[in-house]
Amino acid sequence: MSPSVALAVLALLSLSGLEAIQRTPKIQVYSRHPPENGKPNFLNCYVSGFHPSDIEVDLLKNGEKMGKVEHSDLSFSKDWSFYLLYYTEFTPNEKDEYACRVNHVTLSGPRTVKWDRDM
């Protein structure tokens, strides 16, 4: 076998090994600034440490998807796991509940993490 063919086979084997790795996402929900009722803020959902890259993330207000949600570009860490930041402007108050819902192949179903205004 020529050296270039051997190198190509080795590269394909190493890439296929990367696809076999699955890592469950870590989900963190927090506000950009300390929350004050009636004062505009940003709700953030930072999802990290997951593999493969295909993932669904929704920000929720009282269980319903929020509009005008933006997100960072998909990025990866040194260990080849991925991370993303989803965020939207919101105005906290005492009655509304906010959360982040994530669905990934490593989860048995969507996982919802509530925003804790005291964190």
Swiss-Prot record:
Residues 1-20 form the signal peptide. Residues 25-114 form the Ig-like C1-type domain. InterPro entries: B2Microglobulin, Ig-like_dom, Ig-like_dom_sf, Ig-like_fold, Ig/MHC_CS, Ig_C1-set, MHC/Immunoglobulin. Gene3D superfamilies: Immunoglobulins (2.60.40.10). PROSITE patterns: IG_LIKE (PS50835), IG_MHC (PS00290). GO terms for cellular component: extracellular region; MHC class I protein complex. It comes from the Eukaryota. Keywords: Disulfide bond, Immunity, Immunoglobulin domain, MHC I, Secreted, Signal. It holds the Pfam family C1-set. It is found in: Secreted. Disulfide bonds join C45-C100. SMART domains: IGc1. GO terms for biological process: antigen processing and presentation of peptide antigen via MHC class I; immune response. Component of the class I major histocompatibility complex (MHC). Involved in the presentation of peptide antigens to the immune system. Belongs to the beta-2-microglobulin family. Heterodimer of an alpha chain and a beta chain. Beta-2-microglobulin is the beta-chain of major histocompatibility complex class I molecules. This is Beta-2-microglobulin. It comes from Macaca fascicularis (Crab-eating macaque). The lineage of its organism: Eukaryota, Metazoa, Chordata, Craniata, Vertebrata.
